[in-house]
Amino acid sequence: MGGLWRPGWRRVAFCGWRWIHPGSPTRAAERVEPFLRPECSGTGGAGRGLRWLGTWKRCSLGARHPALQPPRRHKNSNPFTRAQKEEWRRRNKTTLTYVAAVAVGMLGASYAAVPLYRLYCQTTGLGGSAVAGHASDKIENMVPVKDRIIKISFNADVHASLQWNFRPQQTEIYVVPGETALAFYRAKNPTDKPVIGISTYNIVPFEAGQYFNKIQQCFCFEEQRLNPQEEVDMPVFFYIDPEFAEDPRMIKVDLITLSYTFFEAKEGHKLPVPGYN
């Protein structure tokens, strides 16, 4: 390319050949021949100028001709690479399937955990829940333990979302193991619209829950509908199992607290699991 910029070639470019399509080398030579004469260029004859032009033309064509370009390598031309990618895609799909299945299973387990745990606590008395579902013959044949007096305290709470008045009718009563007792809670709806509430409960100390038995299902875990300004009494019929007096862990326990909490029943609302607060 250095020959193109000798004084003679600059003269050709200055005279306007640069802006005219040269066509074939012969035609280009005819156009620039008057300017390549020795008296015009001072760098040699027309033959030398044609050699420069031919050299420039060949270089230009060589740089642009597709046949002279190095072959391009197509992506994914390696069959082993394609096979590996297909294997990776298959593994990723399998992993995503497993993850989705685990997520769905965990979601279903979370919805079933509350009722299952509630049933377990009511059956075993663990987690501070009273034991429910006892045969009447056991109640009739119980022998009260007269020398062991237990104080039962009652507590009532209302969640902030529920505008109810809820309180126990009695703050405390005294019972002995093997003796039945009846207590009442009172709830009132002071608003001007019907409200549905649902309650949960727990017992303190937690270890005493397995001895606190409800003779019949109380109002807990069931929806309670109160119309505007309606007020109702809610009974709790229970007894302390006589085995309470034989448990070494209960030797120093002379106070048991039964606590209820009411929540507004709404679609998608989950009750707290009965037990530890």
UniProtKB/Swiss-Prot annotation:
UniProt record, GO biological process: ATP biosynthetic process
Mitochondrial matrix side: 29-94
Annotated segments matching region Disordered: 64-86
Location relative to the cell: Mitochondrion inner membrane
Example of a GO MF term: copper ion binding
Transit peptide: 1-28
Keywords in alphabetical order: Copper, Membrane, Mitochondrion, Mitochondrion inner membrane, Transit peptide, Transmembrane, Transmembrane helix
Mitochondrial intermembrane-facing ranges: 118-277
Bilayer disposition of the protein: Single-pass membrane protein
Cellular component aspect of the GO annotation: mitochondrial inner membrane
TM regions (residue ranges): 95-117
Domain of life: Eukaryota
Similarity remark: Belongs to the COX11/CtaG family.
Subunit structure comment from the entry: Interacts with CNNM4/ACDP4. Interacts with RANBP2.
Role this protein plays: Exerts its effect at some terminal stage of cytochrome c oxidase synthesis, probably by being involved in the insertion of the copper B into subunit I.
Protein name: Cytochrome c oxidase assembly protein COX11, mitochondrial
Upper lineage: Eukaryota, Metazoa, Chordata, Craniata, Vertebrata
Gene name for this UniProt entry: COX11
